[in-house]
Amino acid sequence: NLKANYQIKKIKYNFDSTVFNLRYKNKNKRIKNITNINVKLLGKHNVLNAAAASIVCINLGADIKIIKKSLKNYTGVQRRMTKVFSKNKNDFYDDYAHHPTEISSILDGVRKVNSKRKIISVFEPHRYSRIMSLTDKFSKCFSKSNLVIICPLYPAGEKKNFKFNLLRFSNLISKNSRTQVIIVKNEADLGKYLKKNLISDEIIIGMGAGIISKWIAGLKYSLWF
């Protein structure tokens, strides 16, 4: 929006960071530009968060240099594209993403700086109610993945809903995101599949709000990896 008081400009996605400019009008209605704001985070949603934080600080009268330095030093919270380990040039990440918008944003950011690497999404569906109400959006948010590995649904206290079918859900993702999808039964099954099929220089991202974080971390030490 060219009429907006604050505008994000020239977003550049790097391997481990994102850089952008922020254009705004000061109290005297003069155009100001903050260039090369660097955040050690990926994804458009993190650019929006960093811009929002900058705007608050600007309106509170904070020094621009301090704003930029603070954002550059901020490494984010745990489970937001947290690198867990690397093995055979394969990089394993863990992310809390469990909503279609989050998933799409993460994968879009990763793909922009890794155009040739294979991206494997290990997705743990979270809550029957969420998956069933957003099935269509979930089915379309994995288009930047070369492979989606679907784990058992984590109910988070909800009673089992027999109307939900994991195979049908997986087939919809394959169809609408136009990508390969497989289902694993448990943690051991995931480890065995990756051990057999991983080659090199691939990116594996665990996504979900249940126990997927433990599964990804466990791959480093498991007997079947």
What is each residue range found by the language model?
Residues 28-147:
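Nucleotide phosphate-binding/pyrophosphate-handling subdomain across enzymes
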Residues 139-200:
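C-terminal helical cap/extension that packs against the catalytic core
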Residues 11-33:
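Acidic-glycine-rich active-site phosphate/pyrophosphate-binding loop
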Residues 105, 133-135, 161-162, 195, ...:
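Short amphipathic alpha-helical segments
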Residues 20, 37, 92-95, 181, ...:
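Generic structural signal for residues in well-ordered beta-strands
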Residues 1-14, 38-44, 68-72, 184-185:
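Beta-strand->loop->alpha-helix junctions that form or flank phosphate-binding loops
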Residues 98, 125-128, 153-156, 209-212:
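Short glycine-rich anion-binding loops that position phosphate/pyrophosphate groups of nucleotides
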Residues 189-220:
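A glycine-rich beta-strand to alpha-helix segment
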